């Protein structure tokens, strides 16, 4: 089984496990079970790894906004660490977070913020993708291609994807108290000539974090 197929199979298994724990109006934290899985990350709410989740205190006067921060200790892509004979390689990380609105509340907004930094010499090309999801629905993505002919000293993507209340893009129709799974996917893919030893790197910014906000509202 290929690495991509294995990751997909494990994602499905984790999602089934998370979904089985989520129930309408259940008495538990609004943002709770989570996992991070891929060639560049591996951790779970009850299994330590190279990602951890931190709660962010609620803002005064904003009772229905919930925030968490995921911190990545060593999620990075380095060309020099890959066998020169490999022409295409990359790193991926899929983060999944269960959101469980309390009784009488529904999800009305989702937001994700992160920063990706890349640098490279002439030679390799880089494809960088950051995507926010709710269940199987894509809420938005930021996609960049750094061409092989370009020398890039510093490229920074300030990713801020938002859907629902206060945003241009809507959320899918959700039921009162309906639990969902928020997803965020990183995909960094490099392509180079065989046996080409050229500098290239992709990393998260200094904070090495992903912040996810969820906004709830009274059901109407």
Q: Language-model segments: which ranges?
A:
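N-terminal leader/pro-regions and domain N-caps
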Residues: 26-83
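Cysteine-clustered segments with highest specificity for TGF-beta superfamily mature ligands
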Residues: 69, 155-198
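Bacterial N-terminal signal peptides
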Residues: 9-17
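Short helix-loop boundary/capping segments
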Residues: 116-173
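Proprotein-processing/basic-patch segments
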Residues: 190-220
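Short beta-strands within extracellular/lumenal beta-sheet-rich domains
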Residues: 87-102
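A short beta-strand element within beta-rich, extracytoplasmic domains
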Residues: 106-119
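Bacterial N-terminal signal peptides that target proteins for export
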Residues: 1-9
């Amino acid at each position: 089984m290929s690495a991509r197929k294995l990751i997909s199979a494990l994602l499905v298994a984790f999602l089934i496990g998370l979904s089985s724990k989520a129930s309408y109006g259940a008495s538990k934290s609004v943002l709770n079970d989570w996992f991070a899985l891929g060639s560049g990350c591996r951790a779970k709410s009850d299994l330590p790894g190279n990602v951890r989740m931190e709660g962010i205190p609620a803002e005064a006067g904003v009772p229905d906004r919930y925030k968490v921060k995921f911190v990545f200790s060593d999620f990075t892509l380095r060309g020099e660490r890959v066998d020169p004979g490999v022409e295409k390689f990359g790193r991926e990380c899929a983060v999944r977070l269960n959101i469980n609105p309390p009784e009488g509340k529904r999800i009305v907004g989702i937001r994700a913020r992160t920063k990706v930094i890349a640098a490279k010499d002439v030679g390799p090309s880089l494809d960088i993708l950051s995507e926010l999801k709710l269940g199987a629905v894509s809420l938005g993505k930021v996609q960049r291609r750094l061409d092989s002919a370009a020398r890039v000293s510093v490229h920074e993507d300030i990713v801020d994807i938002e859907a629902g209340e206060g945003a241009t893009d809507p959320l899918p129709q959700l039921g009162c108290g309906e639990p969902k799974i928020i997803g965020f996917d990183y995909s960094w893919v490099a392509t180079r000539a065989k046996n080409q030893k050229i500098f290239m790197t992709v990393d998260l910014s200094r904070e090495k974090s992903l912040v996810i906000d969820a906004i709830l509202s009274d059901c109407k």
